Design a protein with these regions (language model features):
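A conserved beta-turn-beta hairpin within the catalytic core of GNAT-like acetyltransferases
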Residues: 59-67, 77
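Conserved acetyl-CoA pyrophosphate-binding loop and the N-cap/start of the following alpha-helix
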Residues: 76, 80-85
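Small/polar loops that bind or transfer phosphate-bearing groups
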Residues: 8, 68, 102-103
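Conserved active-site alpha-helix within GNAT-family acetyltransferase domains
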Residues: 95-128
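Short amphipathic alpha-helix that is part of the acyltransferase structural core
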Residues: 1-30, 122-125
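Conserved beta-hairpin
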Residues: 35-55
């Protein structure tokens, strides 16, 4: 059974395996843990103690938030976990006026289901 948590005490580096596959510069489990711990908000999907998905948000807690990462392990995709992660994150952010994220064109439809709209933006991306 999949459970969801925002309690960093329930996450360890050991149960953050298998993420960032295909990235040129993937985060190590240590870096991943540090990212979760330092984000303003995070939600992790757990099967037993194993993290099978997560979403994070950076925010000033008042007017704006940015969702830099959402990922579900390949073997757990197409089970509604990503949808639940986004729903839970957007619930955390419901008091925020501007919520942004960047994504590839092929997944824009996923985010449109949550009321997000395509916008123009700028950024720097180092090799991932």
């Amino acid at each position: 059974m999949i459970t969801y948590t925002s309690d960093i005490a329930k996450i360890t580096e050991e149960n953050l395996q298998g993420f960032f596959v295909g990235w040129a510069k993937p985060l190590s489990p240590n870096q991943h843990f540090e990212h979760l711990a330092k984000c303003a908000y995070f939600v992790a999907a757990l099967e037993n103690e194993k993290v099978v998905g997560f979403v994070t948000a950076l925010s000033d807690g008042v007017g704006c938030a940015f969702i830099p990462l959402i990922e579900v392990l390949p073997e757990y995709q197409k089970q509604g976990i990503g949808t639940t992660l986004m729903q839970k994150m957007l619930e955390f952010l419901k008091h925020i006026n501007a919520i942004d994220l960047m994504c590839d064109e092929e997944v824009q439809g996923f985010y449109e289901r949550f009321g997000m709209k395509k916008m123009n933006g700028m950024g720097i991306r180092k090799a991932r």
